[in-house]
């Protein structure tokens, strides 16, 4: 029985020159768990917003076709009715948290509907979402993953049959990402909820989803069972979808005639080991670690301590005696679980947070009495949410803002140069908050380096991005050496870490527990376990097959385990 029926749906936003959705047809069965995939801008979020009535009742435009969700025609219904049929957790889920305490927030929607049992519904939803026992806590005491679960609980409290989540794990560490998906699986299997996720992380799709819907250029290309969908490597890559690394490794081995082609490519670790387990690694991946850096120290943390004070007066210590040196020219990845202190460390370097004890030196000078606006000439922070970088009504004005405020005579010429460099000339008059994810990232980077800082800090620069946009951001990071020599990123993206970083710093509960190269970090099981990080899937596959194999990318795995296989004519960098 279909719980969602979409027929010949076409939609264009007001003033848009072309349709965002084009003749979409889709049916989803009750109790299904579906991943919707496609490149940035293909219409995934727009399609989902037609299911809960946000389109066309709130966001108007050119709309034709029909959408039926849980036996209700969306166009003919009211949002108040649809909210109890279709629950939606948005990509910017923090905006769905509206009350100061956990139970108040979880039961708020039910209270708005004047349900007499609103508190009971809130408690039930919290239990279903793994937040039992957190009822009296303040929302700012929750971790990122718990906050996301609270947004989900607020939706679940209304007991909708359909749940939609837009990029549910984009900014979460592996532990919280697993927790989110385990909760979703329980809601699907135990409570019969039909779940749709918009997702770029195909390894989670492989583990949890039953079907995959591929969107391209505003229409649905196909809907297939997950294993079959993820085996269509070339088709997915053409839409900028990165299949699981296990799948890509097998695909490349088949292309090189190292193994015979299976009926379906593996998408899980178990299937990958079964198919590739007989191979032998003949060379290790080359570690790109910088080793002992000899360049000058540009930032020094000397016995730094930082605490936050909660509403009830209790102090929470983030750092206690932190000591660390950053050298000129380093490409550093800062990794660790949510709450480990990554963002706090970056804010200390920019002066947005001041240490309670110890000192921070920038090129030998204490930053204790320096204001953030003074430090911004030398240290620039690009925020996790790129929209937070936009304060004017156009990208051009945002890029020029800091330079104009500091009376730089060449601000106009430099703004044009940055627009050209970051391929933003055609977008220069657009409001940055209305751009696509990749365009926002490029624009925020241009703003971040406008003052030629010596140190560039980026918080989760590849979150919410498809493979093409992610590669574009990585290329940009490598291309700005002439402007900014020292770059530090805080990230949960271990593929980015292994492909880009020269030095990896691991934080755990406010302490640096490891600092070194890829081999030194991922080759130490104790560091991996204690920090909660998860090595790239391809690294784990290599280790399962051969304990001394250190392969951090699919390319390294193929070179190491490929033996005397033939190089394909259409070699692609995957």
Q: What are these regions, as identified by a protein language model?
A:
Residues 37-39, 335-337:
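The feature captures the beta-strand-to-loop junction immediately N-terminal to the Walker
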Residues 52, 350:
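Helix-to-loop junction immediately C-terminal to a conserved catalytic motif
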Residues 60-72, 358-366, 375:
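Conserved ABC transporter NBD signature motif
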Residues 117-134, 409-427:
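Conserved ABC ATPase "signature" region
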Residues 138-142, 146, 431-435:
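Conserved ABC ATPase signature
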Residues 163-166, 456-459:
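Catalytic Walker B motif of ABC-type/P-loop ATPase nucleotide-binding domains
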Residues 217-218, 510:
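Conserved ABC ATPase "signature" C-loop
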């Amino acid at each position: 029985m279909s719980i969602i029926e979409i027929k010949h749906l076409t939609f264009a936003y007001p003033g848009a020159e072309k349709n965002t959705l084009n003749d979409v047809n889709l049916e989803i069965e009750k109790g299904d768990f579906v991943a919707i995939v496609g490149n940035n801008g293909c219409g995934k979020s727009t399609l989902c917003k037609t299911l809960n009535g946000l389109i066309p009742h709130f966001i108007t435009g050119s709309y034709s076709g029909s959408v039926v969700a849980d036996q209700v025609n969306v166009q003919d219904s009211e949002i108040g009715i649809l909210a109890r049929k279709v629950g939606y957790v948005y990509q910017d889920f923090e905006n769905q948290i509206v009350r100061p305490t956990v139970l108040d927030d979880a039961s708020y929607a039910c209270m708005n509907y004047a349900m007499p049992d609103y508190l009971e519904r809130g408690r039930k939803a919290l239990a279903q979402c793994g937040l039992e026992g957190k009822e009296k806590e303040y929302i700012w005491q929750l971790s990122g993953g718990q906050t996301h679960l609270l947004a989900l609980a607020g939706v679940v409290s209304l007991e909708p049959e359909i749940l939609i989540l837009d990029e549910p794990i984009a900014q979460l560490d592996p532990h919280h990402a697993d927790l989110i998906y385990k909760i979703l699986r329980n809601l699907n299997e135990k409570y019969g909820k039909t779940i749709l996720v918009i997702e770029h992380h195909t390894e989670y799709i492989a583990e949890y989803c039953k079907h995959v819907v591929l969107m391209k250029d505003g229409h649905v290309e196909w809907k297939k069972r997950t294993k079959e969908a993820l085996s269509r490597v070339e088709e997915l890559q053409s839409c900028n979808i990165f299949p699981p690394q296990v799948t890509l490794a097998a695909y490349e081995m088949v292309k090189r005639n190292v193994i015979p082609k299976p009926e379906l490519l593996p998408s899980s670790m178990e299937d990958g080991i079964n198919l590739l387990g007989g191979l032998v690694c003949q060379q290790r991946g080359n570690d790109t670690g910088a080793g002992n850096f000899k360049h000058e120290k540009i930032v020094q943390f000397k016995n730094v301590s930082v605490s936050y004070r909660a509403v009830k007066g209790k102090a929470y210590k983030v750092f206690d005696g932190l000591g660390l040196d950053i050298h000129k020219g380093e490409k550093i990845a800062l990794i660790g679980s949510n709450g480990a202190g990554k963002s706090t460390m970056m804010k200390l370097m920019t002066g947005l947070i001041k240490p309670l004890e110890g000192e921070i030196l920038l090129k030998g000078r204490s930053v204790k009495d320096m204001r953030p606006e003074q430090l911004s000439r030398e240290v620039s922070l690009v925020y996790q949410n790129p929209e937070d970088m936009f304060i004017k009504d156009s990208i051009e004005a945002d890029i020029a803002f800091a330079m104009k405020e500091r009376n730089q005579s060449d601000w106009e010429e430099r703004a044009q140069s940055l627009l050209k460099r970051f391929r933003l000339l055609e977008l220069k008059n657009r409001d940055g908050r209305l751009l696509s994810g990749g365009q926002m990232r490029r624009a925020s980077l241009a703003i971040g380096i406008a003052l030629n800082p010596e140190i560039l800090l980026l918080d989760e620069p590849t979150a919410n991005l498809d493979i093409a946009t992610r590669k574009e951001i990585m290329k940009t990071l490598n291309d700005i050496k002439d402007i900014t020599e020292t770059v530090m990123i805080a990230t949960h993206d271990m593929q980015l870490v292994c492909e880009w970083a020269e030095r990896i710093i691991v934080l755990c509960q406010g302490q640096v527990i490891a600092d070194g190269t890829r081999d030194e970090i991922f080759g130490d099981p104790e560091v991996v376990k204690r920090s909660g990080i998860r090595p790239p899937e391809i690294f784990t596959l290599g280790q399962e097959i051969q304990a001394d194999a250190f392969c951090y990318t699919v390319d390294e795995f193929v070179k190491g385990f490929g033996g005397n296989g033939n190089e394909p004519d259409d070699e692609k960098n995957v």
